[in-house]
Swiss-Prot record:
Organism: Zygosaccharomyces rouxii (strain ATCC 2623 / CBS 732 / NBRC 1130 / NCYC 568 / NRRL Y-229)
Residues in Pumilio repeats: 86-121, 122-157, 182-217, 280-320, 328-363, 364-401, 505-542, 543-581
Intracellular or extracellular location(s): Nucleus, Nucleolus
Descriptive protein name: Nucleolar protein 9
Ranges of compositional bias, category Basic and acidic residues: 11-25
Similarity-based family: Belongs to the NOP9 family.
InterPro entries (alphabetical): ARM-like, ARM-type_fold, NOP9, Pumilio_RNA-bd_rpt
Biased composition regions of type Basic residues, renumbered to the chain: 1-10
Any one of the GO CC terms: 90S preribosome
SMART domains reported for this sequence: Pumilio
Function summary: RNA-binding nucleolar protein required for pre-rRNA processing. Involved in production of 18S rRNA and assembly of small ribosomal subunit.
């Protein structure tokens, strides 16, 4: 058969090309794939409004709890109880109000166990509706976390003394199971719903006994960046039930298994095996993988499915498992590697997938073009970094061999690549270490450049916030670059030397400004290592730093540098005493500063004033601890030589 060409080839390529749907929330475009109907897509979310007096009362209650100016815990508890009594029968009206929903969250965080169950009961029948509401969904998330903590409490202490109320005998586990049965028919609609998807993610985390992240935590598996910023602005502080793993009963694992089983059946139309699934259903599920709302949910599903599904059904629904390439899968992978949402999806699923699955994707689709993928700064580069972390030694070395020669070029647009390659090299027994160091020096400290300065090339000092008088906060980019330079300093002593050389080339005022900078001061701290820096360079650094040691001691960032100087001046007693005397001369200023007090204590200056011999003993002990094999500068008992030893032999006899 002849090689396909012309129109036939173009048609085949167009047929295999992966093009996700532009809209994911329109039922007509999804047919019956997502199982949505009019009720699921637009559930009832209006439950009435409060009258003016009620609204004013609850606004005042929210403000009171926000200020938290109660005299004692008992007074606050009584206030919470009174407000909860006032909310009876009005809970649904409150949770759909922007201000009153914050009140409900505060009440849920501060209420007791029985009050928590009563709030759960008030939401019976409308849990799905609330999960789809902008404000009520946040209330529901807080309620679910507190409920998970109560489930754990009842699991560990099954009997409670003094419980006579009939409601007290209803366990939180049963309350939870009732709620889960209520939302189960709506799971597919929740996956790509703007608000309900967050509730679904939280439910999966709870059922799988995973860590429940804080509502303001960075890189959270639960909330979006926009949601975390809004959470910080309303100033509702999480309690101890967040940011931890809760023990759950066996019934929760069974519920999770049932959740995912029903979802899989819906996504595959009940197909018995992977080969029986219609390509249309596979394509539509892949479209959900690149949907900004649904993608994080599917990532979490793939992460937890291995708890009870050894076949990894959802992974196999997204990717094939054969050893041969597939045109449609190849097109899908190419889309993932060039799309921001898709690359984030692939990066995350790689991190918790079986190694053999990741190796297959790498060998079939990514290995031949790994350098090109690394050059896709906002997409494929992150996937390549994930491969370096999770592939086996052989594949990691292959990637390093391809990327290390290009490292200086890759760092132009993605400084994180340097971190990934350094860590991969260390993990592989310092594989290609010398070449990595040379590439980094070519990039940041080239020999042919007479004005080379790693602080400028790496930290971009001239365009930074260093020295600004407007109290500008250090930027995220400055923080990222500073951390990278700190990693280089710890990676090899060559970077310690070039960093110190660069610091000494700066004007003294500019160098001292680094000591007061919220980010760059950490770079200064990292080079103050007495065992790595030779005595001459230590003295050169100290000559500059000693000039402003008092002001540095009273600064939030500079005080850490002065603390470091205590060890950095080991075996340099004159410099140590010079710093101690400088602090002593302005002792009032130092002691009146909270940062200066710590410096005073860390430098043992009370002993220096009252018992100078004890202070010198501490200094000598430190010298021995840091330089145990150091030879004294002069022998304790030098041999006495006669004065005439330097005379010529002919004149020695006459000298006595």
């Amino acid at each position: 058969m002849g090689k396909p060409r012309g129109r036939k080839l173009l048609k085949q390529q167009e047929k295999d090309q992966f093009k996700p749907a532009k809209e994911f929330d329109v039922p007509d475009e999804q047919d019956n794939f997502d199982g949505s109907n009019g009720t699921d897509s637009d559930p009832q979310m209006f439950f009435g409004v409060l009258d003016r007096e009620e609204l004013e009362y609850f606004k005042h209650a929210e403000a009171t709890l926000s200020m938290d100016a109660f005299d004692n815990a008992e007074e606050k508890k009584q206030f919470v109880t009174n407000v909860i009594e006032e909310t009876r029968g009005k809970e649904l009206k409150l949770v759909i109000s922007q201000i009153c929903s914050k009140l409900m969250e505060r009440l849920i965080l501060d209420c007791d166990d029985q009050q928590l169950k009563s709030i759960f009961k008030a939401f019976n029948g409308v849990f799905y509706n609330l999960s789809c509401h902008k404000y009520a969904s946040h209330v529901l998330e807080t309620l679910l976390v507190r409920g998970a903590a109560l489930v754990e409490k009842e699991l560990l202490t099954p009997s409670f003394d003094g419980e006579t109320d009939e409601e007290s005998f209803i366990t939180m586990e049963n309350v939870y199971l009732y709620m889960l049965n209520e939302v189960k028919p709506h799971l597919k609609a929740m996956i790509n719903h703007r608000y309900a998807s967050h509730v679904l993610r939280l439910l999966i985390l709870i059922l799988a006994s995973k860590n429940l992240p804080k509502t303001t935590q960075n890189n959270s598996t639960l909330r979006s960046k926009k949601s975390k910023i809004a959470r910080k602005m309303i100033d509702i502080k999480d309690n101890d039930d967040f940011d931890r793993v809760h023990q759950t009963p066996e019934s929760f694992k069974l519920e999770l298994k049932d959740f995912l089983k029903n979802l899989y059946a819906g996504f595959t139309n009940g197909a018995a095996s992977r080969s029986d699934i219609s390509p249309t259903y596979v394509t539509k599920f892949r479209e959900l993988c690149v949907d900004p709302v649904a993608s994080p949910v599917i990532q979490l599903i793939i992460q937890v499915e291995g708890i009870f599904d050894r076949e990894r059904s959802f992974w196999r629904l997204v990717f094939n498992t054969t050893d041969e390439t597939d045109a449609k899968e190849e097109a899908f992978l190419e889309y993932l590697l060039s799309d921001p949402v898709g690359s984030h999806f692939l990066e995350n699923v790689i991190s918790f997938a079986r190694t053999k699955f990741v190796e297959r994707l790498y060998n079939l689709y990514m290995k031949p073009k790994i350098t090109k993928l690394a050059q896709r700064d906002t997409t494929g580069a992150f996937v390549v970094q994930a491969l370096l972390r999770h592939l086996k030694d052989k594949e990691v070395k292959e990637i390093l061999e391809e990327l290390v020669p290009q490292l200086s070029m890759l760092l132009n647009s993605n400084i994180d690549f340097g971190t990934s390659i350094i860590e991969a090299s260390i993990k592989e027994d310092n594989y290609l270490r010398d070449e990595v160091i040379n590439q980094l020096l070519v990039k940041y400290y080239p020999e042919q450049n007479e004005n080379r300065n790693i602080l400028e090339s790496c930290l971009l000092l001239s365009s930074s916030t260093l020295g600004n008088t407007r109290d500008d906060w250090p930027t995220a980019e400055e923080r990222r670059r500073s951390l990278f330079l700190e990693q280089l300093i710890g990676y090899d002593s060559k970077f310690v030397d070039v960093t110190i050389e660069s610091m000494l080339k700066l004007p003294e005022e500019r160098f001292l400004q680094m000591a007061y900078h919220g980010v760059f001061s950490h770079v200064v701290e990292h080079v103050l290592k007495p065992t790595i820096v030779d005595a001459i360079k230590r003295k050169l650094l100290l000559n500059v730093l000693c000039k402003d040691v008092v002001n540095m001691s009273c600064n939030a960032y500079g005080s850490h540098i002065v603390d470091k100087l205590w060890e950095f001046t080991a075996k340099l007693t004159l410099y140590k005493e010079r710093i101690a005397n400088s602090l002593l001369k302005e002792s009032d200023k130092v002691k009146n500063s909270s940062y200066g007090k710590r410096v005073w204590r860390n430098w043992h200056l009370d002993q220096y004033v009252r018992k100078p011999m004890d202070w010198r003993r501490i200094v000598k002990e430190q010298d021995v601890a840091i330089f145990p094999n150091a030879q004294p500068l002069q022998p304790k008992n030098p041999l006495k030589r006669p004065k005439h030893t330097d005379l010529p032999p002919s004149k020695r006899k006459g000298v006595k």
